[in-house]
């Protein structure tokens, strides 16, 4: 259990003492989602997570998966070598029994032209990135045998759910198949400098005008009524992923490679940013409530 505490406290301390620099949603974004979820856990779920994590919060472990990138998580074929083709055709099989103990938990979700999330990581025989599929499997495992699991594997499952639910609500972690497979990696101009849309959503949108800690950020976004939260948390993980993709599309399609982002980009995207963070938090809480209630 010391390993869990040390990893999580390190991530949490970095958030409290410093500012977000980069990485999926950024540590600030992930911990914001975790904090919103912590606030909306049922008493039973809160008690179970408190026991299993030795009192460490979801906000604190929200970026632990990034500490094990390449071991816990792996996105395959994210950028196709042939820009004319969909990336799913380039990876058909992969052997995960490697010395590094790599697990195929993807940071991204893949949806079709109707924003429907695939309930699999295999599309017509080809691997696709699908964090929702892995969250579904991890949640089922925890619900079935959380008490029987190895301590570290249980922590890993909880931490992965927290992180992957966060990732699937980030617009640049959504693959729109087949029309927009690599948009997040498009280079754009922001304040006279070249950056990527992915980098904007992984941190720059938070730090452009804000100097918040994750607690402050969570309070900014956690504004839905109980009725709205019930609506947001309807359905299952695939419904959540589809809704996330639908809500994110305006942000994804607004600008492309070579575009100069306007000075108003941060405020233009703020409604999407805030709604995705709050929805991710509410849904993360709903997943754990369903597992442990």
Which residues fall in each region the model found?
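Positively charged n-region of N-terminal signal peptides that target proteins for export
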Residues: 1-4, 19
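Sec-dependent N-terminal signal peptides
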Residues: 4-13
């Amino acid at each position: 259990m010391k390993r869990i505490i040390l990893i999580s406290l390190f991530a949490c301390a970095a958030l409290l003492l410093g500012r977000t620099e980069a990485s999926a949603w950024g540590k600030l974004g992930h911990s914001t989602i975790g904090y919103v979820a912590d606030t909306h856990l049922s008493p039973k779920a809160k008690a179970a997570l408190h026991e299993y994590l030795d009192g460490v919060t979801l906000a604190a472990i929200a970026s632990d998966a990034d500490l094990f990138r390449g071991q816990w998580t792996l996105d395959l074929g994210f950028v196709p070598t042939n820009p004319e083709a969909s990336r799913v055709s380039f990876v058909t099989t992969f052997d995960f029994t490697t010395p590094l103990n790599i697990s195929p938990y993807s940071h991204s979700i893949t949806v079709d032209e109707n924003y429907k999330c695939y309930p699999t990581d295999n599309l017509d025989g080809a691997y696709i990135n699908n964090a929702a599929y892995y969250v579904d499997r991890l949640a089922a495992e925890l619900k079935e045998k959380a008490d029987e699991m190895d301590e570290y594997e249980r922590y890993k499952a909880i931490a992965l759910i927290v992180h992957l639910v966060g990732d699937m609500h980030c617009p640049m972690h959504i693959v729109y198949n087949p029309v927009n497979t690599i948009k997040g990696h498009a280079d754009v101009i922001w304040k006279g400098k070249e950056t990527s849309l992915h980098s904007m959503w992984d941190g720059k949108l938070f730090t452009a005008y804000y100097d918040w800690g994750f607690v402050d950020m969570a309070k900014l976004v956690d504004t839905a009524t109980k009725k709205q939260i019930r609506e947001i948390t309807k359905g299952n993980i695939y419904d959540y992923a589809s809704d996330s993709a639908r809500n994110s599309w305006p942000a994804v399609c607004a600008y492309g490679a070579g575009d100069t982002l306007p000075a108003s980009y941060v405020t233009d995207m703020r409604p999407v940013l805030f709604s995705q963070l709050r929805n991710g938090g509410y849904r993360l809480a709903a997943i754990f409530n369903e597992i442990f209630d």
